A protein has these predicted regions:
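Membrane-embedded alpha-helices of multi-pass transport/permease systems
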Residues: 75, 120, 127, 184-187, ...
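Gly/Ser-rich, low-complexity
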Residues: 1-72, 88-97, 107-177, 216-221, ...
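Elongated alpha-helical scaffolds
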Residues: 102-105
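Membrane-water interface regions at transmembrane-helix termini and the short interhelical loops
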Residues: 81-94, 182-186, 214-215
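Alpha-helical transmembrane segments of helical membrane proteins, especially in multi-pass transport
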Residues: 174, 178-210, 224-246
Length: 288
């Protein structure tokens, strides 16, 4: 009877260890896969992300918003001309050279406005180039080696049946946590790209104010917002990279149960930091 009980216990332990390792191997695979997916997503330009949406946004910007921006630029240029005339004692002390300066300034403003879409895309091309360069470093440093899982399996073999059962249930719970994390990351990454499209669609309006000293703050803040949203992808990538490196310690900590709960803690921390990436990026670029 004792031999049968021991055999059943060993069989259950083997079954639980196999289940735990299966859950954790899937967990590690999810981490590595998610890092790779985010590297691709945040490193994709608006034009390459979705050609259909990009074409729609470009048409809206050029056919609907640009005429409104043209009216705003006309108002700004006329206002500056009137202001320049009144400042010189109703043209009694007016310098003809100021007219040439005004013409040159207005011409530059028209040129910038007519190329607004290309300028906005150039901002994102710069940020995506930086992100793509960093992605190669990040994905190369977050691989989980088989040796780590082997060390964890050796630790599990020394545990009792009850502890293994509790650990199995916890490892099962962590898989659902990872699914929630994947959905959350999906919302953050895709939400950022939608925000980029929204900013791009209205780009001509703030750009039309750049040439004016009083109204130019709108355009300057808009450009800062573009850089902030662009480089938010870099912060997202850094957050996930830090998370993946921290997760590597789960297989070498010597305490499987503590490692499982540590993984949950890291997951919650990642979710919190992903929510903060937009705020941090805007504070860096002084955008509001």
């Amino acid at each position: 009877m004792g031999i049968l009980t021991e055999w059943i216990t060993e069989w259950l332990k083997g079954l639980l260890i196999e289940g735990i390792m299966g859950n954790l191997e899937g967990l590690f695979d999810t981490v590595n896969t998610r890092v790779g997916e985010i590297s691709v997503q945040v490193g994709t330009t608006p034009a390459a992300w979705n050609a259909g949406v990009f074409s729609l946004i470009r048409q809206l910007s050029e056919t609907v918003i640009s005429p409104i921006a043209g009216l705003i630029l006309t108002f700004v240029a006329t206002y500056e001309l009137i202001q320049m005339i009144l400042e010189k004692n109703n043209m009694h002390e007016f310098d003809v050279a100021n007219i040439y300066k005004w013409v040159f300034k207005t011409t530059c403003a028209i040129l910038i406005l007519s190329n607004t879409f290309n300028i906005v895309m150039a901002v994102f091309d710069v940020s995506q180039s930086v992100i793509a360069s960093a992605a190669g470093i990040v994905t190369g440093a977050t691989d989980i080696t088989p040796d780590m899982l082997a060390d964890l399996e050796m630790t599990l073999e020394t545990m009792e049946l009850g502890s293994l059962l509790g650990l199995f249930l916890q490892s099962f719970l962590i898989k659902f946590t990872m699914l929630a994390l994947n959905i959350f990351i999906f919302v953050i990454v895709y939400g950022r790209m939608i925000e980029i499209y929204l900013l791009t669609s209205l780009a001509p309006i703030p750009v039309a104010t750049l040439s004016n000293r009083e109204l130019g703050a709108m355009g300057q803040n808009y450009l800062r917002s573009l850089f902030a949203v662009g480089f938010q992808g870099m912060l997202i990538l850094v957050c996930v990279a830090i998370y993946a490196v921290l997760i590597q310690g789960i297989a070498t900590g010597g305490d499987p149960i503590g490692a499982i709960w540590g993984c949950i803690g890291y997951t919650v921390l990642l979710c919190f930091m992903l929510m903060k990436t937009g705020t941090i990026s805007k504070s860096i670029f002084s955008a509001h």
